[in-house]
């Protein structure tokens, strides 16, 4: 009989920095440019690993061996960089694009090394696009004050998975599943109120690059 226990205790902080610049082309056209950075750092805390083996007889457990180890600061978060561009026309049409890069290939894998696990990581990238249109936010016609929204994104995986080629039997690390998503939504202004009811739907597809991984599709 074997018992394994992994326990983590993390207490840490997160620092985000950002800059934004707005340039007004003319009365109706505006461009916004922004950049963000999240500090990558080692998470403060401990991981505890416990393993016990024994035998069971007549309802009693007899311990044969037990080991326990504490690993300080076992995880590290990646540096994250982001940039975005937004175009606004007459406060009615907004179009934006964002790019994000997470430097997972420099993250510390102390916990995996301790477990003698072979792990490889990728830098994760994500590109997102979105748009919102309101025909007239001051119109008396309710339909013209509805905000119509749509968006899409594509992201690469940060993890690599162990893959065995079914033809050759060779084992190697390959990129994990890519992810795609599209969404649509509406912002419905409430009568006699400044509040708004937001309704949206999203389709997500998780697509592996090779056979052996499950393809996933979500609607939410």
Question: What is each of the regions a protein language model found here?
Answer:
Residues 1-220:
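Outer-membrane beta-barrel porins/channels
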């Amino acid at each position: 009989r074997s018992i394994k226990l992994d326990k983590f205790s993390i207490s840490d902080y997160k620092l985000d920095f950002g800059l934004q610049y707005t340039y007004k082309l003319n009365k109706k056209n505006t461009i916004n440019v922004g950049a963000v950075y999240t500090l990558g750092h080692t998470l403060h805390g401990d991981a505890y690993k416990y393993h016990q083996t024994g035998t069971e007889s007549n309802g009693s457990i007899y311990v044969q061996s037990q080991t326990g180890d504490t690993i300080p600061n076992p995880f590290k978060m990646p540096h994250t960089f982001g940039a975005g561009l937004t175009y606004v026309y007459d406060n009615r049409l907004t179009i934006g694009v964002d790019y994000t890069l997470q430097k997972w290939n420099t993250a510390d894998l102390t916990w995996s090394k301790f477990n003698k696990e072979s792990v490889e990581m990728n830098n994760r990238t994500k590109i997102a696009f979105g748009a919102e249109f309101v025909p007239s936010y001051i119109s008396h016609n309710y339909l013209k004050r509805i905000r119509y929204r749509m968006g899409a994104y594509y992201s690469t995986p940060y993890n690599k998975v162990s893959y065995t080629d079914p033809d050759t039997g060779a084992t190697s690390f390959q990129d994990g599943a890519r992810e795609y998503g599209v969404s649509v939504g509406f912002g419905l202004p409430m009568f006699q109120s400044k509040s708004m009811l937001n309704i949206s739907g999203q389709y997500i597809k998780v697509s592996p690059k090779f056979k052996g991984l499950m393809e996933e599709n979500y609607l939410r």
